[in-house]
């Protein structure tokens, strides 16, 4: 779950189905821990991503996006990005690693070959299985995908197509209304002063060169 930039913390939303509060909330600016990326499918919420195999007997590394990393095992069957439905078993922390990195076994995967096939596969849960968000300042990052981006004058400048996070905070990937390559805008109060999910838009204050093409390389640049 995410929180509007600059809003105060009010505690987790309650759930009448699966525990929505287990999904990591968006962090305030400058927080150390990254947040989960939004799913490209608005009907799904990402919960984790597999990494490299661990050993020879089917175990595999998994980066959990839930606020309590081990809680990912309690969601039952999950949607995998390769089209399968997978269920986790024997989940434990990865020794000597960050708290969100786990060693897991997937039901039906019993050897290293099967574990290798999971590398970079993501796990998601159907949004409808999560509880309702009752706090007006909370939402899923998936809710942002498809919203129109306007500037302060009400001019449409683009559409949000993804919400990546590379470790430094959530970013809005915006496809410009005029066409051309997408650009990334930090999802902070300074750059996104207003958010109206119900109205289908955000108001942004981007730098003037947000969609500018890369400039020419300096003459002495060896690249």
Curated annotation (Swiss-Prot):
It is found in: Cytoplasm. It comes from the Bacteria. InterPro entries: PRC_barrel-like_sf, PRC_RimM, RimM, RimM_N, RimM_N_sf, Transl_B-barrel_sf. The keyword Ubl conjugation does not apply. One of its GO terms (cellular component) is cytoplasm. Keywords: Chaperone, Cytoplasm, Ribosome biogenesis, rRNA processing. Residues 1-12 have a biased composition (Low complexity). Residues 136-210 form the PRC barrel domain. Its main location: cytoplasm. SUPFAM superfamilies: PRC-barrel domain (SSF50346), Translation proteins (SSF50447). An accessory protein needed during the final step in the assembly of 30S ribosomal subunit, possibly for assembly of the head region. Essential for efficient processing of 16S rRNA. May be needed both before and after RbfA during the maturation of 16S rRNA. It has affinity for free ribosomal 30S subunits but not for 70S ribosomes. The PRC barrel domain binds ribosomal protein uS19. HAMAP family: Ribosome_mat_RimM. This is Ribosome maturation factor RimM. The lineage of its organism: Bacteria, Pseudomonadati, Pseudomonadota, Alphaproteobacteria, Hyphomicrobiales.
